[in-house]
Amino acid sequence: MHVIYGGTFDPIHHGHLRLALEVSEALEVSRVHLVPSHIPPHRGSTGASSAQRLEMIRQAIAGEPALALDEQEVHRGGASYTADTLRQLRAELGPDCPLVMVVGTDAFSSFDRWREWQEIPGLAHIVVVRRPGSELPVGSEAAQLVAERCVGSASELHSRPAGLVLELAPPLLDISATGIRRRIAAGRSPRYLTPDDVCQSIRAWGLYGARPVEGQ
């Protein structure tokens, strides 16, 4: 089974990393692939370049065999759309390999506004991570999809290539990339919110309003 977890990762932090590991354990897979978007279609420009975000992810997952970096959206260029990414992966994996995309309830609540959203269940399973205080709108397309396709165990995702929904409620760290960027802009340290190597890169590159390290 091939599992992807997409996002801007601007910057990647311990909340992302812990969630990815929780998913790998819950789904009983050896690896979760982090897929940073190039230009997110539903957000403004990010604070770090695509190349910088890729490098920070490499630093963050170094030495962790359960996490891998998938650079396809960055290399493809342009706006990053989930349906395009899943089609590319389906072509690479073949028709029979179970493919899973991981998404939080906050992002999934607007599922019917995603480009070609109707095609996604035919390409992959969807794992919806329940976040505290974030519920799917009653009567929404997302809620209906969950009601129609939700299964009770991860083992069912292994039995077919696509089309099912699984809800997970793992313990989540209350860390956000937005909060980290604001903290840095205010002159506060992001240490212990994101890996030390990532903190060092943020300072070295002067990202998010950080004061660059002299001589770099």
Curated annotation (Swiss-Prot):
GO terms for molecular function: ATP binding; nicotinate-nucleotide adenylyltransferase activity. Its EC number is 2.7.7.18. Pfam families: CTP_transf_like. Keywords: ATP-binding, NAD, Nucleotide-binding, Nucleotidyltransferase, Pyridine nucleotide biosynthesis, Transferase. The keyword Hydrolase does not apply. GO terms for biological process: NAD biosynthetic process. Pathway: Cofactor biosynthesis; NAD(+) biosynthesis; deamido-NAD(+) from nicotinate D-ribonucleotide: step 1/1. It catalyses: nicotinate beta-D-ribonucleotide + ATP + H(+) = deamido-NAD(+) + diphosphate. It is an enzyme of class 2 (transferase). It comes from the Bacteria. Belongs to the NadD family. Catalyzes the reversible adenylation of nicotinate mononucleotide (NaMN) to nicotinic acid adenine dinucleotide (NaAD). This is Probable nicotinate-nucleotide adenylyltransferase. It comes from Marinobacter nauticus (strain ATCC 700491 / DSM 11845 / VT8) (Marinobacter aquaeolei).
